[in-house]
């Protein structure tokens, strides 16, 4: 597993808790190389200096401690550590949620630049769809631990199929007050069910304004509506009649109906 782990690294959500306060920056960033026995100490130090410059810091920061840096700088250190082994995949777990809004855009731009420069693949975990839009090619929406929609990024924002995705997008702020006034704000009612004991059928049905009896009884499968856009919903939104009929025909022999009858589309 060790060779595989070199290719997968993580950037943590909290830039304060994820850095050891007793270690200097140089040690923090070089630890992955030391653990994997990559290079001599001199080579590791040179590599750390290069990485620090790549993420917008200075090699002079090598001997400083985490408490000497701001939150944004600490997150840059965390990103530098994730790059030490030249990974192919980086899992970014809410990497900007703990930062000031003024710093978030800088961090997103850095991640975007690194992705292009180093040919990285990100698994970007976030609850803010406004942030996700800037870094994603494909977006997966999850609810209570289940994948409910998977779509090319821009298509999700223009044509959400799952009602939960629709509600999430309605909460994304729009800077234009005229457009914001015309948009419907969907407020979900009720409490979020327990992930330990989720509802039967579709897990979203207790809070869904389109839910019917079939939603309470049967869990909808993930269905491909074309163009790589998949959703798990008995009453899909923004799907034309022809596509609904095609999907219904393809699943006619299934014991679990994939979608509601085409006449119920909206």
Predicted segments with their positions:
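Short catalytic/signature loops enriched in Gly
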Residues: 1, 152-262
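Interfacial catalytic loop of ABC nucleotide-binding domains
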Residues: 14, 46, 63-65, 183
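Conserved ABC ATPase "signature" region
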Residues: 43-60, 166-170
């Amino acid at each position: 597993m060790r060779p595989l782990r070199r290719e997968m690294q993580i950037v943590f959500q909290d830039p304060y808790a994820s850095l050891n306060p007793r270690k200097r920056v140089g040690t923090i960033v070089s630890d992955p190389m030391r653990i994997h026995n990559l290079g001599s100490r001199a080579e590791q130090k040179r590599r750390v200096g290069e990485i620090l410059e790549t993420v917008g810091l200075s090699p002079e920061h090598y001997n400083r401690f985490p408490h000497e840096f701001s939150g944004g700088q600490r997150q840059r250190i965390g990103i530098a550590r994730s790059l030490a082994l030249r990974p192919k995949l980086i899992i970014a777990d809410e990497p900007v949620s703990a930062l000031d809004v003024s710093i978030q855009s800088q961090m997103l731009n850095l991640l975007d630049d690194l992705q292009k420069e180093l040919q990285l693949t990100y698994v970007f975990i976030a609850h803010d769809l406004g942030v996700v839009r800037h870094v994603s090619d494909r977006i997966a929406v999850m609810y209570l631990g289940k994948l409910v929609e998977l779509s090319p990024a821009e298509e999700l924002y223009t044509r959400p199929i799952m009602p939960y995705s629709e509600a999430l997008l309605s909460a994304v702020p729009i800077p234009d007050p005229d457009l914001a006034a015309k948009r419907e704000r969907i407020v979900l009612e009720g409490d979020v069910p327990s992930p330990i004991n989720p509802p039967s059928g579709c897990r979203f049905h207790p809070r869904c304004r389109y839910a019917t009896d079939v939603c309470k009884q049967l869990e909808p499968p993930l269905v491909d509506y074309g163009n790589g856009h998949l959703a798990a919903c008995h009453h899909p939104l923004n799907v034309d009649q022809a596509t609904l009929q095609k999907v219904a025909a393809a699943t006619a022999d299934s014991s679990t109906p994939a979608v509601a009858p085409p006449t119920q589309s909206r």
